[in-house]
Amino acid sequence: MKLRLYERADAPEVLRLWNTAGAAAGYAPLDAGKLDELLLAHPAFCGESTFVLEEKGALRGFAAGCTGDTLAQGAVRGYVSCVLLDETCDTAENTALLLGAVEDSFRAKGKSVAAVTFFNPLRLPWIIPGTDGHRHNNMPGIAKDIPLYERMLALGYREAATEMAMYLDLAAFAYPAAMEERAAKMAAQGYTVDWYKEGVHRGVDEMVASLGNSMWDAEIPAAAHGGMRLLVGLS
């Protein structure tokens, strides 16, 4: 098994791994264009922190990390984006080999922490467990029911938080009467909820920027100014 840096010519094999090993880990299926957009040709993609395992000319493993001083805690953190292994070589040893290469690349850039969180700008879609293919907007970490989770703990990673999928089937939803009563009480106190109206409601860019979340910075103002229906609280 040969460990080496990822090359652009590896993209078709990475796509195969994504839609096999990645699908088994819970990632949403992607075509080549979407995988490029979200990962392999994303502006935050770091070729020097992306590695493959090769056996007799075939890719058996892939791991990607990214760094950047403008990222959240980017002065000290490197972000592990994904680790994929073909089922024929999905072992703790190969996981350690790939992760070790990514971590070494972080150290070479002066980083002291390897993290797997939603602050990673490479936001990879995954299927919410128990749903009929519904996607969460970004892979928040490592699913607890796959081998990679226990392997990373054994390698010294620690669980900092558990994210629960945000999903509700609204087919039979009915607005509760109690919420109508609460809305009336809040309105009497000068607090209301409305749809965001461009040119009427102001300060969304400044409000989001003050929260210091790069994902929200990129998505929420653009959605508001682009006409997406967003709820806003007003006082």
Where are these regions (language model features)?
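Compact recognition or signaling/catalytic modules
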Residues: 194-202, 216-235
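Conserved beta-strand in the GNAT
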Residues: 52, 58-68, 79, 230-235
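Conserved acetyl-CoA binding element of GNAT-fold acetyltransferases
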Residues: 74-88, 117
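A short helix-loop-beta-strand connector motif used in the catalytic cores of GNAT acetyltransferases and
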Residues: 39-52, 61, 73, 221-232
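Short amphipathic alpha-helix that is part of the acyltransferase structural core
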Residues: 1-39, 52, 163, 178-215
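Acyl-donor-binding surface of acyltransferase catalytic domains
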Residues: 91-187
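Basic, amphipathic N-terminal segments that precede the first structured/catalytic domain
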Residues: 31-34, 42, 46, 73-75, ...
